[in-house]
């Protein structure tokens, strides 16, 4: 069995420009993986996510954003239009990936893994809306999740990230 069997490091995904990215490149970084949507009422959290990234810039931490149209068809944009929206409106500098499905039988394999304890070995939590957040440790293991209404600027989120070291 692979060292990555219970790790997000086993997955390859595509950046918003179509470039393939191996999540093993984020080995030894704590991650916050978030499904985003530009037309969602939670979209202002993009600015909070960027602020969190800046606050933790000297630690081994990164945010990975995955646009999705799964909830309320709230991601009408595609490709670089999503990147442009995130940068122009919220100053986003963290990686934004290609639009994917995050729930159901058509969900991207990464999101199937994130949401299923049988696959990730830790917890079950399928996104119920946009801006569901998964906290991943440096070994690529799912360690916690936060519902959309939990702001990235919250003490709860910050403390959990800091505890990972």
Can you describe what each PLM-predicted range is?
Residues 112, 116-165:
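Thiol-/selenol-based redox modules, centered on thioredoxin-like
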Residues 48-51, 81, 109, 156:
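Extracytoplasmic/secreted proteins, especially bacterial periplasmic and envelope-associated proteins
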Residues 36:
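Hydrophobic adenine-recognition pocket in adenosine-nucleotide-binding enzymes
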Residues 60-77, 93-104:
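Thiol-based oxidoreductase modules, predominantly thioredoxin-like and allied folds used
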Residues 29-30, 39, 43-67, 87-90:
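Conserved helix-turn-beta segment immediately C-terminal to the redox Cys motif
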Residues 80-128:
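Short, internal strand/loop/helix patches
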Residues 1-24, 42-44, 108-109:
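N-terminal "domain-start" segment that seeds a small globular fold
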